[in-house]
Amino acid sequence: RRYQAAPVSMSAATKQQGEYVEYPNLIVNLTNYSVLYKGHSVDMPPKELELLYFLASSPNQVFTREQLLDHIWGYEYIGDTRTVDVHIKRLREKIRDDENWALSTVWGIGYKFEVRR
């Protein structure tokens, strides 16, 4: 299925605000585009980092693929909604679920950053 996102982009709105999110074993810093996982720096492309930051900024909130495309890729993205699935898969390969949090699939709906404690 192809999707054209509405003209809303998370990256333009938040990059300059100096924001970061922190959980046990995970720090995502949007200001300097860095991720620390279990004390180690993790390299990831900007869209993966923005996706992780966006999800982690709204813990336990479920987002559809379309909502994630709107916020991360913005209006210029014209393509398959499954690109979100690919980015989530790559994130999961780089940062494994923790006892305190997880990148969770909500079947039939989308994804969430689940805080377990």
List where the protein language model places each region.
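A structural micro-motif at secondary-structure boundaries
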Residues: 21-49, 106, 112-117
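Regular, well-ordered alpha-helical segments
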Residues: 1-5, 54, 93, 100
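DNA-binding patch around the recognition helix
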Residues: 43, 86-88, 92-117
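Alpha-helix N-cap and coil->helix boundary residues
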Residues: 63-67, 79, 83, 98-101, ...
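Basic, amphipathic DNA-recognition helix from helix-turn-helix-like DNA-binding domains
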Residues: 1-22
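Short amphipathic alpha-helical recognition elements used for nucleic-acid or partner binding
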Residues: 34, 40-73, 91
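Conserved catalytic core of two-component sensor histidine kinases
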Residues: 45, 78, 85
